[in-house]
Amino acid sequence: MGTLRADEISNIIRERIEQYNREVKIVNTGTVLQVGDGIARIHGLDEVMAGELIEFEEGTIGIALNLESNNVGVVLMGDGLMIKEGSSVKATGRIAQIPVSEAFLGRVINALAKPIDGRGEISSSESRLIESPAPGIISRRSVYEPLQTGLIAIDSMIPIGRGQRELIIGDRQTGKTAVATDTILNQKGQNVICVYVAIGQKASSVAQVVTTFQEGGAMEYTIVVAETADSPATLQYLAPYTGAALAEYFMYRERHTSIIYDDLSKQAQAYRQMSLLLRRPPGREAYPGDVFYLHSRLLERAAKLSSRLGEGSMTALPIVETQSGDVSAYIPTNVISITDGQIFLSADLFNAGIRPAINVGISVSRVGSAAQIKAMKQVAGKSKLELAQFAELEAFAQFASDLDKATQNQLARGQRLRELLKQSQSDPLAVEDQIATIYTGTNGYLDALEIGQVKKFLVGLRTYLTKKKPKFQEILSSTKIFTEEAETLLREAIQEQIELFLLQEQT
């Protein structure tokens, strides 16, 4: 048996001491006191930060929302069925963030930016905080470029600009989502990245929207963030912030983006559920006191950036659902006060066959004509006033037995104006076609036609202009001004098309 010499032993010990790497890792831990309804109460976690991500023993992630003297209230980003009372928990030292990249375009993801469309993982090298601060005053500039929705009623009377926040509000089943999806379809070829956030909707409704985008060729510039009705409240609450983080990524890269939140009523309900389960004091309609801040910090992230930051933009179109047309409820009034205008959709108009069912009288854009091209301002300037006067006159005329000729003419003109605003779903119009349509109506060219013939005539006129008078569209797209030459070309086309149309109708 060999003997070890004392100097060998000391050398081995010295080597071991030199190799010893003393690494102390401090982990902030806690113990689950109670779990249920998507909420966990944790004892310990003394150093935890508000909004910090918490990791449970079995892998579920949560967010620390309530920091109380003797426990921490954590909302779970998952069902948490495997979490047991007494199991250990650790703080991660991170706050919620998601990966971001160009590869997200054309994909359907959840609130954690994980793909749910079965097309594999999404590669990304960057990440972005879900809750980012909104651009400051110096970082912004005023809105001046139009974001064309393709809907005549909106682009002519309630114009939306790039960087604006325009609320779409109305009862259920009045076409709110249709207005939003048509806006996305109309961005084809406009170099605008679109993000559609579905919050608490039926999975079948989301699938239908995705199919509409695919058929219209819109998925190549669109990201869909979906948390359906069966998702945990925490994820429904986070989904809009995830969408905003993705849109911001493109905005700060000098791109134009548009984001639709469908809808914020359901996000507020999810937040209310979380807050009540966390035992936060309820306020009006049982919503927590900070529900205004919930939406304001989200919508303030929409902006038109200054030239120093590259003039990118993020246009927000939040949707809010009302009950029986009550816009004075808590969430509708909150979001109306945050946004730069609202498009009000009326159930009565929808049921009367006027679609999109936009109530022009109480819809407004606080950016106004700054978000219109000059040609549209020239043509559509007086149409909103005419329609408002017509609506008033129509209500009065119901009680009058004999009306004078001027009133009858005004009513006839109003009915035709209302008719030209009707549009089929997924059929957005180019701005040149809209200008031709409005000009035809406001200048009395439709007065000779029956109301039932208006739509057919306008479709024919737009086709005729494209084929026989292409110069009209060239002038408008190049100069953005309704010049005398353009007006002459349009007048000629209308006269020729009316003669042709009346001849066809007689035969």
Curated annotation (Swiss-Prot):
Key words of the record: ATP synthesis, ATP-binding, CF(1), Chloroplast, Hydrogen ion transport, Ion transport, Membrane, Nucleotide-binding, Plastid, Thylakoid, Translocase, Transport
Binding site for ATP: G170, D171, R172, Q173, T174, G175, K176, T177
UniProt-listed InterPro entries: ATP_synth_asu-like_sf (IPR023366), ATP_synth_asu_C (IPR000793), ATP_synth_asu_C_sf (IPR038376), ATP_synth_F1_a_nt-bd_dom (IPR033732), ATP_synth_F1_asu (IPR005294), ATPase_a/bsu_AS (IPR020003), ATPase_F1/V1/A1_a/bsu_N (IPR004100), ATPase_F1/V1/A1_a/bsu_N_sf (IPR036121)
Pfam families, sorted: ATP-synt_ab, ATP-synt_ab_C, ATP-synt_ab_N
Listed GO CC annotations: chloroplast thylakoid membrane; proton-transporting ATP synthase complex
GO terms, molecular function: ADP binding; ATP binding; proton-transporting ATP synthase activity, rotational mechanism
Compartments, record wording: Plastid, Chloroplast thylakoid membrane
Membrane-topology annotation of the record: Peripheral membrane protein
Primary subcellular site in the record, as a coarse category: plastid
Catalytic reaction list: ATP + H2O + 4 H(+)(in) = ADP + phosphate + 5 H(+)(out)
Self-association and partners: F-type ATPases have 2 components, CF(1) - the catalytic core - and CF(0) - the membrane proton channel. CF(1) has five subunits: alpha(3), beta(3), gamma(1), delta(1), epsilon(1). CF(0) has four main subunits: a, b, b' and c.
Function: Produces ATP from ADP in the presence of a proton gradient across the membrane. The alpha chain is a regulatory subunit.
Family of the protein in this entry: Belongs to the ATPase alpha/beta chains family.
Designated name of the protein: ATP synthase subunit alpha, chloroplastic
Organism, as annotated: Phalaenopsis aphrodite subsp. formosana (Moth orchid)
Gene: atpA
